Amino acid sequence: MKILCRILSCLATVCITVACSSTAHIVIRDGADYGLTAEFIPSSLLEKNITHLLKQKSEHTDGQSVFNGQELKEAFTKEGISVQDITLQGALGLRFVCTVPQTHELLEDVIGYDKKERKAVLRISPENIVSFLEILPQESRDFIDMLMAPLFTGDAIPPAEYEELIGAAYGKKIAAELRNAEFTLTVDVPYKVQTARISPAGTVTVQTKTEKTSRALIRIPLLELLCTVGMIEVQMQ
């Protein structure tokens, strides 16, 4: 349970930051590898502020990505994950496409799929995220540490207080963007979903793709996600 959520972490983490276009797409299949595609495109304000802070901490140069594509690919490959594409865009932009064996141990605590019962459960928790972050290259972890989010630190901070913390550290404009931002996750499952729910925060809507497949669109307010100290769980049955 390391890389998939590390990605869902790096995305749900990084991406999770503030005003940006961030999406993740998981495809659950019967008898085949699961697919994962994710993309994070930061707002110009976010990239400008984070880049400025990184330049103060290190020898970071304009346009240089905070991620190392080769290191990320090697980390995924080491975990038995097939990487189709990793694209770096500017300093913070990231897009990747990969497939994960459905029996891979990294899926156990993140995605639970019962083929017989036709039920899927997705879980996001601080414990899951921490274990994922440990595998990231140091540079990526340094960037994530700058967010100071309860989801990563385990410290209980109310959303309003965390918003104030971000405002004091990175400016009121970024804090305002964070207040209105969402993380969007699309999940395709190989069965027709009758009921879907998410708790304790967020919304989930279901679309029927075919008579035998469904797609769930999950939206979670970033403030709620970043301040999670318990578990966010999505059930589709």
Which residues fall in each region the model found?
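A generic structural micro-environment signature
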Residues: 7, 26, 32-34, 195, ...
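Residue-level signal for mature regions of secreted extracellular proteins and peptides
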Residues: 10-13
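Start-of-domain marker
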Residues: 22-80
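Bacterial N-terminal signal peptides that target proteins for export
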Residues: 1-8
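C-terminal motif of bacterial Sec signal peptides marking the signal peptidase cleavage site
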Residues: 18-19
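Mature, soluble, non-transmembrane domains
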Residues: 73-237
